[in-house]
A protein has these predicted regions:
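N-terminal signal peptide c-region/cleavage motif recognized by signal peptidases
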Residues: 21-23
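Short amphipathic alpha-helical segments with coiled-coil-like heptad repeat character
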Residues: 1, 17-18, 63, 151
Length: 359
């Protein structure tokens, strides 16, 4: 898709279909698996990238020859997502991969899917039913990592703001739990404000602006997402930029390299959008009988001021809202994706290799 604003991409519902290619014996597929992505929320750039890399993967081998893929958005509405899942069960899909609107509210319908022989894989905002496999990073550790770094930078004392995520999701709950674990060990740190940023830069900027004038000196920022928006609100209020622990937004990392003339000391931890592709690969391999039914935890990528690198982990020419962890890197990379896959869902050149943990 063309590069357009976040607001124009926010939608309460959406559906796409991708029937890509014919079965190819070279990739071991005699029939194509019907695999559907059920996404609860499309209101930020991370979710858009997550869907885009899923779409791009469907256009690349081995998925092109082995998978008929579809994707659906429910506007963060549990009832609507449940109805879409009901429709997928009726369509007799082979697998459902889901980024859920609620950790518990969809368990019943997902149990029905599993009872009909449909493979269910939950990623990012996972569900609690044991009938669904889980693909994720360690979200409690995510929150702890941000808070640990911040506590050290603040020498264990000072005022912190917490910018949280989408309420009611497992990711939001677990990240907050991780941070609170660290604050409990550092009684000198006071959380002076806790409010949602919805994992969205514009929302985080607006909500920060609305509370900032009433707050005392802020010595640290802990932010689940929308980090660059929080920093922009500080600049607009003529506040100094304190040490900041946040997500993998390109705009935040631009601040970390001082690209805009304002440099911040930070740690940027990423929840990789390619979790959708890892889930797709897990489904493909299980349906092919080449991988066991098991949960997968992958490491989350992160950078500090010492390790952030232009052209690899920050991109000055891309929008601030772009999430830089769209691909993995290094000798043990889970996968490698091109920028266009994340920007508009276009295929990268060559075959897409996704490395799952040892079975």
């Amino acid at each position: 898709m063309p590069l357009i604003t976040r607001r124009s991409l926010i939608a309460t519902t959406g559906a796409g279909l991708a029937g890509v290619g014919l079965a190819a014996r070279a990739f071991g597929a005699e029939k194509k698996h019907k695999i559907a992505l059920s996404n609860s929320y499309i209101g930020n750039k991370w979710r858009i990238e997550m869907e885009n890399v899923f779409k791009a993967a469907l256009l690349m081998e081995p998925f092109k020859s082995q998978v008929d893929g579809s994707w659906f958005n429910s506007g963060n509405d549990v009832s609507k997502q449940s109805q879409q899942l009901t429709n997928l069960i009726a369509e007799r899909v082979d697998a459902i991969i889901i980024d859920a609107a609620s950790p518990t509210g969809l368990n019943g319908i997902l149990n029905q899917a599993a009872g009909r022989g449909i493979l269910v894989i939950s990623f990012d905002n996972i569900v609690t039913t044991p009938k669904a496999l889980k693909v994720n990073t360690d979200q409690v550790k995510f929150g702890e990592t941000l808070a640990d770094w911040l506590a050290k930078k603040m020498n264990g004392k000072g005022n912190v703001i917490m910018v949280t995520g989408v309420a009611g999701t497992s990711v939001d709950e677990d990240r907050n739990k991780g941070a609170d674990n660290v604050w409990a060990k550092n009684p000198g740190i006071k959380v002076v404000s806790r409010y949602t940023g919805m994992w969205d830069s514009s929302t985080a900027e607006r909500n920060t602006s609305s509370v900032l004038n009433s707050l005392p000196q802020i010595d640290g920022i802990w932010c689940q997402g929308g980090t660059d928006g929080v920093l922009k609100a500080f600049l607009a209020a003529n506040r100094p930029l304190p040490p900041t622990a946040g997500e993998a937004e390109n705009g935040f990392r631009k601040f970390m390299i001082g690209y805009n003339g304002h440099k911040v000391d930070g740690i940027s931890v990423g929840q990789p959008p390619f979790l959708s592709v890892v889930s797709l690969e897990l489904a493909r391999q299980i349906l092919n009988g080449s991988y066991p039914k098991k949960d997968i935890t992958i490491p989350f990528p992160y950078v500090t001021n010492d390790t952030v690198k232009v052209g690899e982990t920050v991109f000055p020419d891309l929008p601030d809202s772009f999430f830089d962890d769209f691909t993995d890197s290094g000798p043990n990379a889970v996968l490698s994706l091109c920028e266009q896959a994340a920007l508009d869902g276009k295929a990268c050149t060559g075959t897409l290799k996704v490395t799952l943990p040892a079975a």
